[in-house]
């Protein structure tokens, strides 16, 4: 099975078992993984939203079945390149979206997202493969 990276929104939908049918179909047969950024964002949500033991347990259980792409020097270098090129184009990108894109591009993995517009520049200018569509 080939790997596909879930952005934080898709990870959230997957965690709650609420993936849109078209995305669920597109992900069938793939092994899902997330980036270190999504781990951080999910932890932030857990704290800010006051998740109780049940919801925290669901997250821990879900995480056992989803791999995590870690930070490394190649990802850091790619992030710097992506940020610089986007700035030169006059379209600076959010830092966390750039980290997620960098992880995907370094490992040549597609990104599942419901927010195509957030990653469209990375697809157009950097060759990031996107799976998904707009949020339902």
Task: Enumerate the predicted regions with their spans.
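Acidic, PIN/NYN-like endoribonuclease modules and their adjacent C-terminal/linker elements
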Residues: 1-3, 101, 105-136
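Short, well-structured N-terminal submotif of metal-dependent ribonuclease cores
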Residues: 1-35, 44-61, 136
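Generic structural signal for small/hydrophobic residues in well-ordered secondary structure
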Residues: 7-8, 42, 79, 104, ...
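Alpha-helix/helix-capping structural signal
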Residues: 9-10, 37-40, 74, 117
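Nucleotide phosphate-binding site architecture
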Residues: 11-12, 40-43, 69, 120
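A generic structural signal for secondary-structure junctions
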Residues: 16-19, 28, 47-50, 83-84, ...
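Short secondary-structure capping/turn micro-motifs that flank functional sites
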Residues: 62, 95, 119-121
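Active-site neighborhoods of divalent-metal-dependent phosphate/nucleic-acid chemistry enzymes
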Residues: 67-114
